[in-house]
């Protein structure tokens, strides 16, 4: 472990995380899996203007609503609370309701119209005889917001099949412009500059791309009750721009060494003209010998 006296940069405590939940509502489209995304308000305190999946903070009422939800035998209390939070947020933000009647039939547009997005969610559903479909919500991934950011969340990315017969309607205050998009299409539009998405969304869409059907996604997540991946990314500078990395990527280790508390202060540029300080007593010296075996150099 690196001693604090060896660090090049002053340390600071990362902002605390807040528990939240988000859900990828999926459907099978003509060209493959499609995911429901919406644009965040331009005045939002976190990721303004970004296209995201519906979600938000977990409330105490979500944990108190277990008795109003179905659950899988293997589904933990934590995962059920997260699923209920995601169901609630999907309704409040997009008017999508993952719930059933006592006879097993799915909630209809008439059921949705009878509920208020502003009133307590679980109590309304109970009064209307609706049971939340927590058993239909699965854990895909676990993201923890990067340590350098001022607002941080500890958030599972959940997945569920979009209920048939329902259409998303944005609340026009937190979320706007709901759209169905294939993961590869969303990534291409982002690269073209017309569809802003943030790092965890990018990496999640990349990992969804190989799946050909919604069933394939849900089966992969149902294989066990653990996320398919967990990440708290790290950030540095590359060619003068912000660059973020997951744990399996080589720059992550260098960033963890130079900035263990996650500050975005270190430059990652690969250069051979002079040594690059990593710690007060450690430098990276790169030889200019690029090749198949050495990459950009050693």
Give names to the regions the model predicted.
Residues 1-277:
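N-terminal leader/linker segments that precede catalytic domains of diphosphate-processing enzymes
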């Amino acid at each position: 472990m690196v001693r604090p006296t060896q660090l090049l940069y002053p340390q600071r405590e990362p902002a605390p995380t807040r528990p939240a939940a988000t859900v990828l509502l999926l459907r099978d489209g003509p060209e493959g899996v499609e995911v429901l995304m919406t644009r965040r308000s331009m005045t939002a305190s976190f990721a303004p203007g970004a296209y995201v999946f519906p979600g938000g903070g977990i409330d105490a009422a979500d944990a108190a609503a277990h008795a109003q939800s179905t659950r899988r035998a293997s589904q933990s209390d934590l995962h059920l609370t997260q699923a209920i939070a995601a169901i609630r947020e999907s309704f409040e933000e997009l008017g999508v309701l993952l719930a059933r009647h006592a006879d097993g039939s799915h909630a209809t547009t008439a059921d949705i119209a009878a509920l208020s997005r502003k009133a307590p969610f679980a109590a309304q559903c109970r009064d209307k005889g609706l049971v939340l479909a927590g058993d239909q919500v699965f854990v895909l991934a676990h993201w923890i917001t990067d340590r350098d950011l001022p607002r941080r969340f500890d958030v599972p990315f959940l997945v569920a099949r979009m209920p048939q017969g329902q259409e998303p309607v944005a609340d026009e205050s937190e979320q706007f412009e709901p759209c169905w998009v294939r993961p590869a299409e969303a990534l291409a539009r982002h690269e073209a500059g017309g569809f802003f998405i943030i790092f965890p969304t990018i990496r999640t869409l990349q990992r969804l791309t190989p799946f050909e059907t919604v069933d394939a996604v849900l089966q992969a997540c149902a294989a066990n009750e653990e996320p398919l991946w967990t990440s708290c990314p790290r950030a540095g500078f590359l060619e003068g721009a912000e660059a973020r990395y997951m744990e399996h990527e080589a720059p992550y280790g260098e960033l963890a060494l130079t900035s263990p508390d996650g500050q975005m202060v270190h430059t990652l540029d690969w250069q051979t003209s002079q040594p690059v300080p990593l710690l007060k007593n450690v430098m990276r010296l790169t030889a200019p010998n690029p090749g198949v075996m050495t990459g950009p150099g050693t």
